[in-house]
Design a protein with these regions (language model features):
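Ribosome-associated RNA-binding proteins
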Residues: 1-143
Length: 143
């Protein structure tokens, strides 16, 4: 695959999303694997509360009208990156189309070499409070 291939294992979500958005706007194709292993920093209860509030937003008259927020790990990561792109401009939408996010590693990418974003590496946090995206996803889906 052409472009950049990123392993999301132990990457900080916001920092990774910022870097990926810059790559996308520069015209590169970006593929992220292991989206479920991306981490979010902060107090677990506050993170749950913030994301649950987002997913509970709906039109009271007709809840099928949205807004819609993702509940699966790959979609949570993808939506976070979308928030860092100029979504209402054609350049932002074109950049968003160049993004692929997967849970785990797809069979077609088994032998591919993945890069790590140094600025977003979660190993530098030490014992800081963190939450993995798969834990957040299980909470949002009620599992």
């Amino acid at each position: 695959m052409r472009g950049m291939n990123i392993d999301g294992d132990n990457m900080i979500l916001g920092r990774m999303a910022n870097e990926v958005a810059q790559y996308l706007l520069a015209g590169q194709d970006v593929t992220i694997v292991n989206a479920e292993k991306v981490i979010i920093t902060g107090n677990k209860e506050n993170i749950f509360k913030r994301f649950k509030h987002r997913t509970d937003l709906a039109d009271r008259a007709n809840p099928t009208h949205g807004p819609f927020f993702p509940k699966t790990p790959a979609r949570i990561v993808r939506r976070t990156i979308r928030g860092m792109l100029p979504w209402r401009k054609p350049s932002g939408r074109a950049a968003y189309r160049r993004l692929r996010v997967f849970e785990g590693v797809p069979e077609t990418m088994e032998g591919v070499e993945f890069t790590k974003i140094e600025n977003a590496d979660g190993a530098r946090l030490g014992t800081h409070k963190t939450l993995r995206v798969d834990q957040l996803s299980r909470y949002l889906r009620g599992e």
